[in-house]
Amino acid sequence: MPNIQNGKTGKWIKSEEELPAFPECVFDHLPSFLNEVVNNSISLDDRDTILIGAIVCLSVCFHNICGVYDERIVYPNLYLFVVADAGMGKGALTLCRELVAPINRNLHELSKRLEQEYKEAMNAYIKGKKDGGMTIPTEPPMRMLVIPANSSASSFLKILGDNDGIGLLFKSEGDTLSQTLKSDYGNYSDVLRKAFHHELVSLSRRKDREYCEVSNPRVSVALAGTPEQVRKLIPDAENGLMSRFCFYIIRFKRGIRNVFATNDISQSKNAMFKLLGDKFCHLHEEFVRQGNYSFSLPSDLQEHFIEYLSR
């Protein structure tokens, strides 16, 4: 956070005026799809927010890619919190959800079909129960990609388990998640901390004789909120979530942009991102069909990484 001193190290975090935007060289080398995405931005802060938001939302879809970091297998998943005062443009993050909406919708439709088949099978089982020889049908998994941020802890783990440990927590108001984590039924902060490192997560409730376990979770998180909402979610630096989140802070600016730039619904940001979501859905289907991938940095970039972070 800007203008907040780290009392233990004595170092000052950069002031809000010093916070940089992503350099132009980043945008000069984007993949073609991401280039289409950021071309819908209306300012530098908007472009940065859309880029990092898109990367985080798409990261949950690349569960077939892994690499080795610090001698451990890692996946592309990231945790993001876009921080800004009210009315400063953090709402651009909501557009990024449209990029994965078709995939989420397809999974919901699959769940409905499986649920209907299950009900029909159960009816047949009940009618033929007296005859014997019939096996009780198994309840189908609840398939989805985007997990509601107000889910209870057991529901969160159940949904993860139903989806092979894959899920995106997306909320444009970060206090929804912080309120959920503070409640008795929804405190899965520990699950999020472990899921970041793809560690086995589990939950046991004695009252309901309930036990949930998910191995190799691959969870991405995209949140937006005000500085106060960050403090509610992560009260201090000792909280383990602090080191797991990427924070992008939108600087305070006076004035108003032209909110009447277009009157054409087909040219609205909503319409453009829905088209991009449909395009990504097709790209994703083809990508997953190709199989699994492993990623590693070239040795010269590994050396540059170590050298840079050793300064």
PLM features: what roles do these ranges have?
Residues M1-R311:
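Phosphate-handling catalytic cores of nucleic-acid transaction enzymes
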